[in-house]
Every structure is written in structure tokens, then in C-alpha cells.
Amino acid sequence: MDFSQRSFHRSLSSSSQSPGLSMSSSIYRRGVAPSVYGGAGGHGTRISTSRHLANYGSVPAGGNLFAGNEKMTMQNLNDRLASYLERVRSLEQSNSHLEQQIKHWYETNTPSTGRDHSAYMGQIKELRDQIKDAQLQNARCVLQIDNAKLAMEDFRLKYEAERGICQTVVADLHGLKRVFDELTLTKADLEIQIEELTKDLHLLQKEHEEEVRSLRAHLGNNVNVEVDAPPSLNLGAIMNEMRQKYDAMAQENLQKAKEQFEIQINDLQQQVTVSTEELKGTKDQIKEQRHTYQVLELELQSLLNMKEALEHTLEETNARYGSHLAKIQARLNSLEGQLVQVRTDTERQIHEYNILLDIKIRLEQEIATYRRLLEGEDVKEYQLSTLDEKDIKKTRKIKTVVQEVVDGKVVSSEVKEVEESV
């Protein structure tokens, strides 16, 4: 028997009606010996009859049933009994053969519920551990990426702060340069003023000498007239005193200007030195932070590449197990479809078996009746019965199973039965 899966299954069965029994007392009777034949499984089972004409004559009321042709009747009944017994044995053998085939099919095709999957548990556990390790590694990578981002943000803030400080120092340097330029200009102005004052002093000395010479020349040509007057002023002494006074003031102003200039120059040099050192330290720190930033950027890039590789591996693992799961699901759907087919075939065979069992029961009843007749039970109450041939009605039953399969899975199943006469 073939239990392969099909979308449409047709099972044909034919039922037959055995000839009915009629009781009559006509002179000519037809002796009927029915026999049953059919294939394995009960397909195409029908009952055929063999007939012969016998002239029994008239049977008187209350006469013997086997009067006239008793030997032929007994032989006919024995033949029919042997035929029935042989048919019963044949049906029993066919039934046992069908049961063995069904049992064999269930043993070979039905998936075992107690199947040992322990061989796969180790591999499944190992794969689950790998998936968990990959997930943990992915989480670690994400955490490291977040930490790197936070560190990068901190370094960026520090870099911005140091750059602001550097810009402030540069601005201070520019301011100090401007102050230095102003002091240089002030120094030049003071030097110019000193030169001008020196020139004025020389000019005043020349004028004083000229005035003294002119006065001496004028006094030498005049008569010395003595008058009673207060003593005249000593212009030379006054000029010398004024010259000394102005020289002292010029020297004092020059000394003060030099001291102030030196003080400002020293302060400016100290500020420039400090600013230069700070600028150098800031440049070194900026260089170090730039190097750290490049290192962190490389680490971030490597972590991103590792993350992409892990995500790709995870996707491949999910796809591989998804395809494996889809294959298992398709196999499960196929087995479910085969199970539905087996159940349908089993129900059909049970139906056919019930038909054969009914035929067997009727045959056993007829055998029991014939046995009673042979044993002589109530012989006087029976008259010779004849089996008139009746029209055998054949029917064909078409069973159609329609299954809708989507992605290897049985979505719906519909069974249609159509019975038509042949």
C-alpha cells in the first residue's frame, strides 16, 4: 500500500446488495449459491451467484423439505458452506495482511516521540554559549565605545579650555608687545626731548657768553663812573647756578626715565618669559592631547569594525538557524500532512473493514442458518426457499481530500464525498 502524500486523494469503493431471499412454492426452483470475491482491502467487493434449475415437484403441505432431490440440495448446501468458509478465511487473511501493512507503515513513517536528541544537545548548548558570548562581547564593545565617546568629549572640552587659555595668552602677548612698542616710543620721545634740552642749554650758554663779551666790550670803552649804588648782580654766577640747576634736573629726569624704563622692561621681560613658558607648556599639552585624540580615534575605529564584524556574524548565525528552523518546520508540516493522509486512509480502511465485517457477520448468520437446516432444526416449518436473482446495484463513492498548503504548512483541509451509481 502506498501512503505517499498527495494534495488530492481518491478512494473508490463499491457496495453491493446481496440477493434477497424469497419464499415461494412454485414447481421450478432455481438453486442459488452465492460467493464473495474481492481484492485486498475490500476494494471492489461484490457477491456473485451460481444458479441451476431444479424440478422439485410439488411439495405437499407439511411435507419434508428435502423430499425429491435431497442429495443434490445437501451437496449444494455443502458447497456453499465450503465457499463461505473459504471466503471467511480469505477475508481474515486479507484483514491481517492490511493490519500488518498499516503497522509497518506506522513504524517506518510515523516520527518517534521518544527520539533521542541528546546527541544534538551538546552542539545546541555550545552554539547557545557562543551566542551569549557574542552578545556579551557586543555589550562590552558598546560600553567601550560609550566610554571612548565620553573620554573623547572630556578631552574635547579640555582642548577647548586650553585653546581658550592659549588664545588669552596670545592676546596678552599682543598687548605686551603693544605696551613694549609704546614704551619704545616713549623712550625715543624722551631721548629727543633730552637732545632738544641739551641743544637749548648749549644755545643758552652761547648766548650768555656773547652777552658777557658784549658787556665787557661795552664797559671797557666807557669811563668808570662810581656811583653810590648797591652791588650789581653776578650774571656769570647766576648762569652757572641756572646751568647746574638745569643739568641736575635733566640728569634727575633722565635717571628717573631710565629707572622707570628699566623697571617696565624687566616687568615686561618677566611677563614675556612666563607667557612663553606657559605657551610652550600649552603647546606641549595640545600636542599630547592631539596624539591621545588620534589614538582614541584609531581605537574607536577598530571597535566600530569589531562591532560590525560581530553584527555580521550574529546576522549570519540568525540566518543559518532561521533556515534550519524553517527546514525543521517544513519537515514538521510534511509529517503533519502525512499524518492527516494516514488518518484519512485509516478512516477509509476502517470503513471498508466495517463493510467487510458486516458481510462476514451476514455470512456467519447464513452459515448458522444452513447449519441449523443441516442439523434438522425445525425442518418441517421451512419450505424450500429459492434465491431469486436481484438486480445488483453498484455504487461508486469518490472521496476527495483538498488540502491548502502555504510555505509547506497545511492551512486548511476539506473532505468531499460523492456517491454515484454505476
From Swiss-Prot:
Residues 106-123 are annotated as: Linker 1. GO terms for molecular function: structural molecule activity. GO terms for cellular component: cytoskeleton; intermediate filament. Residues 1-25 are annotated as: Disordered. Residues 378-422 are annotated as: Tail. Keywords: Apoptosis, Coiled coil, Intermediate filament, Keratin, Phosphoprotein. The keyword Coiled coil applies. Residues 1-69 are annotated as: Head. PROSITE patterns: IF_ROD_1, IF_ROD_2. SUPFAM superfamilies: Intermediate filament protein, coiled coil region (SSF64593). Residues 239-377 are annotated as: Coil 2. The record marks D228, A229 as: Cleavage. There are two types of cytoskeletal and microfibrillar keratin: I (acidic; 40-55 kDa) and II (neutral to basic; 56-70 kDa). Plays a significant role in maintaining keratin filament organization in intestinal epithelia. When phosphorylated, plays a role in the secretion of mucin in the small intestine. Heterotetramer of two type I and two type II keratins. Associates with KRT8. This is Keratin, type I cytoskeletal 20.
